[in-house]
Amino acid sequence: MKKRWRHTSRLTALAIALAASAALAGGAAKDTNDSAPMAPEASCMCLWQGGFADVQATTDLVATVTVVQGKGNSLDLTVDTILRGREYNETIRLWLQARDYCRPEAELFPAGSRWVMALQRITDTVPGGFDPLTPNISYGRIGDYTLSSCGGYWLQLHDGRVTGNLVDAPRWEHEPKMTPVLLELLSAYIRGEVNREALQEASREDPALRELMLDTSEFLRDVR
């Protein structure tokens, strides 16, 4: 009788422990599901749309810009040259990564840096997109712009040349190895004056071979 009681007690204790464990697991799952939609670290889900040459035509504004300053997930940009589209303000606001928005981090664009960007204008209010308690962390305001991370929507601009995911570069690689391409050539492509192959050829040139050709030309001039 004593052994049977001990056996029953152990089974009862085991059942209580299993029930408690299941309850904790269920509660944890509920907490995770409730917090997931608003988790700031949640990553976005999108398909790669292509390099700059492919995506620029689908956006509202393509321009060379200079970063003035940043606050939260926003940047203030001066519009230096408009390559396609219209914008009458000299300074525009760009909203970048926050929550699960498919946008690059603001830290990638330091003050003073210059870029060629293909931007989308915000035209609709998004429910929950603005929190008055954190006004510098937002989806963005109507009339401002966003920059997508789902393609090569930006190129770095330095000394009149651009680098980045321009044409046929690896997916999700925003700083591929390439030869810097003249901004004038990119502008001509956007205007439809040169084709995609011209951008490909310019970005794939061997810098060493180009330097050798320049040296050879100078040598021939000196000989003459």
Q: What residues fall within each predicted segment?
A:
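Netrin-like (NTR/C345C) domain of secreted extracellular proteins
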Residues: 26-34, 102-224
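Short boundary/loop segments of OB/S1/cold-shock single-stranded nucleic-acid-binding domains
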Residues: 36-59
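Bacterial N-terminal signal peptides
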Residues: 12-22
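Bacterial N-terminal signal peptides that target proteins for export
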Residues: 2-12
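N-terminal post-signal-peptidase region of extra-cytosolic proteins
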Residues: 46-53, 94-105
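Structural detector for short beta-strands of small beta-barrel domains
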Residues: 58-77
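Extracellular secreted precursors and ectodomains with disulfide-bonded cysteine-rich loops/domains
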Residues: 42-44, 100, 148
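OB-fold (S1/OB) nucleic-acid-binding surfaces
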Residues: 73-96
